[in-house]
Amino acid sequence: MWFLNSVNLLFLVCSVALHLDAVNAWSPTNGYAPGVVDCDENINLVRKADAVSDDEADWLKVRHESTVPALKDFLQRGFKGFTNDTSIIDKLLATQDTAPKVAIACSGGGYRAMLSGAGMISAMDNRTDGANDHGLGGLLQSSTYLAGLSGGNWLVGTLAYNNWTSVQAIINNMTDDNSIWDISNSIVNPGGINIFSSISRWDDISDAVEEKKKAGFNTSITDVWGRALSYNFFPSLDEGGVGYTWNTLRDVDVFKNGEMPFPISVAVGRYPGTQVVNLNATVFEFNPFEMGSWDYTLHTFTDVRYAGTNVTNGTPNVTGKCVAGFDNTGFVMGTSSSLFNQFLLQLNTTDLPSFLYNLLHGFLTDASDDYDDISIWAPNPFYEITNIPSNYSQSISEDDTLYLVDGGEDGQNIPLTPLLQTEREIDVIFALDNSADTDQSWPDGFSLTQTYARQFGLQGKGIAFPYVPDVNTFTNLGLNTRPTFFGCDARNLTDLESIPPLVVYMPNTRESFNSNTSTFKMSYSTSERFKMIQNGFEAVTMKNLTKDENFMGCISCAILRRKQESLNYTLPSECDACFEKYCWNGTVDATTPISSTTSSSASSTSTSDSGNKENSARILAPRSTLSLLIGGLASVFISF
C-alpha cells in the first residue's frame, strides 16, 4: 500500500516541459499535413539491415556512459544483504564492452497495458517514490532499449515524447485537468457531459486529417485514431501535438545526451482486404532515426524523418526535394495500435447524442473506406528496394503503398523481435506482459510461444529465442502469475541459431487490484488509474519485495548471467538458489487447465476480450491470431 499512500500524499505541481527545437520538432507545415523540404541532391534514404545504423551506434556510445554507472549502482544495491561476493560486478562493469546490456519490452493491451505497464516501469525507475527501497529502482536507468507495442507503445511514447517524463510525475498531476493520461472520459466523447468540448475536439481532428488529404496524401482511420490519442498523451501541446514528429526526439537534449533508453515502436505489415496475419508477417520498427525491418522480406531501413517522400530504391524522384512531417508522433503510435480503429468504427453501439453521432459517423466512414485496421504509409518508402533476397517475397517493394497494422496482430504481443537482433548485443530482456490471453483477460505466455516458434520459420533467420513451454504449462505451473526466467543456462541453448538473451518474464497478475480489465475499456477514473499503476508496481516486485526479500538480488543474478557465462566468470553461490526458484526448468504440463484465470484472486469482474483462443499444447505451434482478434472485435460494445 505504500505506493498508493505516497500518491495520496503528493500533490506537487510538476510541469512536463518539452525542450524542442521549433524548426525540428514540427511538420514544415506547422500542422498535421506533411510538406516538401530541401534535402541533399545525392541523398539515398535506405540502407541494408546488416547492422545498427551509424546514428544508433553513435548514440549507444553516449548512452553507455549513463547505463554503466547506473547498472553498477543497481547491482551493488541488489547484492547488498544478498551476498558478500560482489567481485563480479567490478569485473564486468569495468568497461562498456563487458557490461551487460539491458532491454525492456512493453506488451500491447490497450489502456490496461499502458497503466499496468506504467506501474511496472515505475517500479524500475529511481525517480519513483520508494522504488529504490521497495522495488527495482534504477533498472530503467540501466536499460539501453525500451520497446513498446500498441498499448505498451502508448506508455513508451508518452514517456519518451514528453521529455522523458516519469510515471511519478504523471501521477503527481493526475488530478489536474488536461493532465497526461486524463482518460476519465472515452476517447470518442472526451468532453463527457460537455458535448460542445467533444464536438470541438472532433472538429479539430477532422480539419487536421483533411489538411493531410488536401496535401495529396492518402489517409485512413489510423490518422483519426492517432490524432485522437495524441490529446491524451501530449495535452500540453497545441491540439495534442498536431505537427509533432517522431524524429523530433533525435534533437531533444535528454535523448541526445543518452539520459533515456532507445525507444522502439513496433508494427506489422499487412495488405487491406486480407485476413491472414501470421508469424511470417514482416515486423516493422520505428525508432528516432529510422523505420524498417530486420526481416528478410524487407531487410531495409529508411530515415524516418523523410517518410512520405516519393522514392525509387531510396532515391527521391525529385532531386534535392524530400517530404517531412509524415512521421507524426500520434500517427506512429496509432499505427502500432491500429487494432483499436475498430473501436471508432463501432459508433452504432454507443449512446452518443444523435448530432455528435452523425458528425462522427460521416467523418469516420469517409476516412475509413476499406482500411478498417490498416495504417497507410504512402508513398512506400521501400518502393523497388534491392535488399530483399531472391528467395523471399518481393511484395513489399513492389507496391507503391506500405500497409501496416497493430504490432500484436501476428500474436507476438510483446515487442521482442527488435531486441533479439544479434547486432544489438542485448544480454537480458525484461518482458512485461499485460496481454489478455485467457477468458478472464490475464496473460498466459502466448506471446512468448509465438516468438519462440517464429525463429524456426521463414522470418526466423538471424534470431534466437529461449525455449518456453506451451500456454497450458504456463498456467498449470503458475508461470503466468509471477516473474519467471527463460534461457538461464546457455549450455542448453546451443541448438539455436545463436545464444539468445535471457528473458525475465513479468506478467500482469492480481496483487491489490483486479487489473485484468478489458482491452477495449476506453475510460478509467482517476482512482482506477492509480490502482492499476500500483498493482503493476507490485506485480514486478513480488509485492514490494514482501514475498521475496532477495528478489532484487535474484534480478541482479539474471542481469549478470549472460556476460558471466560468455566470459567464464563465477556468480555468487547465492545466485544458484535464485535460478532454482525463478528459472523454468523444462517441466511441461500440457493438460487443459481447470481454470484459465491467472489471477491470484479467486474471483474477477473483468469483461473477457480473449475470444475463443485454443491454447496450443505444443511448444512449436505457430498460428495466426486473426480469428481471435476478429472474434474479440465482433463483440465490442462501447460505453461512456
UniProtKB/Swiss-Prot annotation:
GO terms (BP aspect): glycerophospholipid catabolic process
Matches recorded under CDD domains: cPLA2_Fungal_PLB
Subcellular location: Secreted
PTM note: Highly glycosylated.
Protein's UniProt keywords contain Hydrolase: yes
One annotated Gene Ontology cellular component of this protein: endoplasmic reticulum
Compositional bias segments (type: Low complexity): 594-610
pH dependence statement: Optimum pH is 2.0 and 7.5.
Pfam family of the protein (one): PLA2_B
Main location as per UniProt: secreted
Domain PLA2c span(s) in chain numbering: 38-589
Signal sequence residues: 1-25
UniProt KW Coiled coil keyword: no
SUPFAM superfamilies: FabD/lysophospholipase-like
One GO molecular-function entry: lysophospholipase activity
Protein task: Catalyzes the release of fatty acids from lysophospholipids. At acidic pH the enzyme hydrolyzes all phospholipid substrates without metal ion. On the other hand, at alkaline pH the enzyme shows substrate specificity for phosphatidylcholine and lysophosphatidylcholine and requires Ca(2+), Fe(3+), or Al(3+) for the activity.
Protein name: Lysophospholipase
